[in-house]
Every structure is written in structure tokens, then in C-alpha cells.
Amino acid sequence: MATQEEKQKALAAALGQIEKQFGKGSIMKLGDTKTLDVESISTGSLGLDVALGIGGLPMGRIVEIFGPESSGKTTLTLSVIAQAQKAGKTCAFIDAEHALDPIYAAKLGVDVKELFVSQPDNGEQALEICDALVRSGAIDVIIVDSVAALTPKAEIEGDMGDSHMGLQARLMSQALRKLTGQIKNANCLVVFINQIRMKIGVMFGNPETTTGGNALKFYSSVRLDIRRTGSVKDGENIIGNETRVKVVKNKLAAPFRQVDFQILYGEGISKAGELLELGVKHKLVEKSGAWYSYNGEKIGQGKANSMKWLNENIEKSDELEARLRAELVANPEQALMADIEQSENNTESESDFE
């Protein structure tokens, strides 16, 4: 029977052979790797960055964002592109739906002159383009909008009534098998936007499912469920949507956290509104009655006026965001405890009301 010393020598020889054949870093101890702190790209929503646990969407991984129509899926991905471009990243948008509006993208902060766009004719072409971009190693963020629009070539060339059972699911499964390793090696973030369908005949449980089969569910490191929960009004006018995002899968931090924020028409995610709410929750912004104060200075009466002050005072707004990000992203447990405490307070308030 081999002694411990002989086992260690055999292991060292095997590791040496593997590294010689496949390159240095092809095998290592989990604790030795310097890539435990995953690089991330901000989503443009501070609350969502905190809920994700790593400060944003992870580089070198596949992410799925799904939800009903007009829930904010494309807006969220355009916000990710805007944040990536600010960080000096190169981005590409594969527009399988042929519906990307450059004017709207520019309003959300996207530098449309620097954004690579492709409008493929079929699903195979879209995924081949995605594969080529990933393999180039020169693109940092790729958005595919959407999985439902990745129509297989056979379906496009066939007659309208032809049955193509499972064709799209097989296409996605094959593509993701090829892409996953390349995405990790290129340290590229690939975001798939997906739509929701209803499963027929489901009596119990959730009848909703996403298109393109189950492969994307397995290969995704992060899955975000985005929903519209209400309207944002200015008097009688509707100026945006109340939006809720739930992290339904997360391989890099605790899943199942959710966050609420506003998406304003023609503006995108309301940064000032989030800063106020998170600032009050974590005691960086003081609220006394209807008045909000920051660093001992009154900034406005009512939420709307305070948001206006933050939008006008960019330096103060950036300072508050930096303080919140340093406190919450570095200590996600603290953010979680604050959410639990607020939930308990809300429950007590409801009990008192009853």
C-alpha cells in the first residue's frame, strides 16, 4: 500500500504532466487561485448590485435575464452596457428581435458609436457570431436579445405549419456546450434575454417557463427574474414603472434576494430614488418628517424634491453612492440584515394597524 509521501510524489508528477500538456493554471487548489474575487460589471442599479452579492454581473460567466413583455429586460441590459462602457469595456449587442432603438439606448447612457450591433437572419447565425466574438477575446460584454427570437434555419426555410419539435432547445444546448469554456477563458460576460411562456395543463405549481429548453438554466451562473409591479406617476401622468428583480439563481453568492427600483421612461433606472431609499435604510441619509438631510444639510422636502437635488448635485450623489457601495457591496451580510430588520418592522406596523 502506497505511503502518504509516495502519494504526494505521484500527485505532483500528475499535476506537472497536466500543466505541461494543458498549460499552467489548468488545475489548482481552490484556495490557491487568485480569481476567487470575481470581476463584475455594475447593472446600473445599486440595490441590484448589492443583491447579487459581488457588486454586479460576473465577468467570464453566462447570465439569463427573463420576464414578461415590457418588464424592463432590454432596459436593464442597456444599463449594463452603459456601465461597462464607462469602465472602458467593449460591448456587442446581438439583436435577434431586430428591435433595438439607438435613440433610446443613447438616452440610457450607451455610447452608440462604440457599440457593435448585429441583426442575424436566424438562430444559428446569431450563435455563430456570438461564438466568434467570444473567441476573439476582444469583446467584454455580449447581449443576446432574445433567446425566443433565435429561430432555427430549418424553421425559417420550412412551411408555416411544419412541426419542429425541440429544434431550438437542441440548438441552444449545442451552442452553450461550445460557448461556456470559451466565455470563461476570454473573461467575457454573455447575457441572454429570455421571454416567458405558459406550460399547458399545469394544475399545481408555477405554470411559467422560459423558452429554449433547459440548457440555459443549467449553464447560467446568474438568473434574474424581472417584473413590472406598478406605475410611477407625476400627478395624473405615468412617467415610469415600478420594477422588482429577483435573483432566482446565483452561483457566486446567496440567491433569492430581491430588489425594487423605478425605471423612468426615457431615463432608465432611477439612480437618485435608489440612493435616497438605501441611504435612509442604512442611516447615511436622515429623514425627519417629510425632510431629507445628508451630512447635516437639508436637501429637500419630499422624495421628489430630494431626488431633484441629488440629480443636480452630481458630486454629492457620487459621494453617497460610493459610501453605500463601500458599505454594502463589501459587507453583503449587513445589507441582508437591514432587509430582514425592515421586513420585521413592516410586519409589526401591519399588526399594529390591524
UniProtKB/Swiss-Prot annotation:
GO molecular function ontology, one term from the record: ATP-dependent DNA damage sensor activity
Major site of localization recorded for this protein: cytoplasm
Keywords, alphabetical: ATP-binding, Cytoplasm, DNA damage, DNA recombination, DNA repair, DNA-binding, Nucleotide-binding, SOS response
Membrane-spanning ranges: none
One Pfam family in the UniProt entry: RecA_C
One cellular component term from this protein's GO annotations in UniProt: cytoplasm
GO terms of biological process kind: DNA recombination; DNA repair; SOS response
Protein family according to the UniProt entry: Belongs to the RecA family.
Biological function: Can catalyze the hydrolysis of ATP in the presence of single-stranded DNA, the ATP-dependent uptake of single-stranded DNA by duplex DNA, and the ATP-dependent hybridization of homologous single-stranded DNAs. It interacts with LexA causing its activation and leading to its autocatalytic cleavage. Plays a central role in DNA metabolism, participating in general homologous recombination, recombinational (postreplication) DNA repair, and prophage induction.
Protein name from the UniProt record: Protein RecA
Source species of the chain: Haemophilus influenzae (strain ATCC 51907 / DSM 11121 / KW20 / Rd)
Phylogenetic lineage: Bacteria, Pseudomonadati, Pseudomonadota, Gammaproteobacteria, Pasteurellales
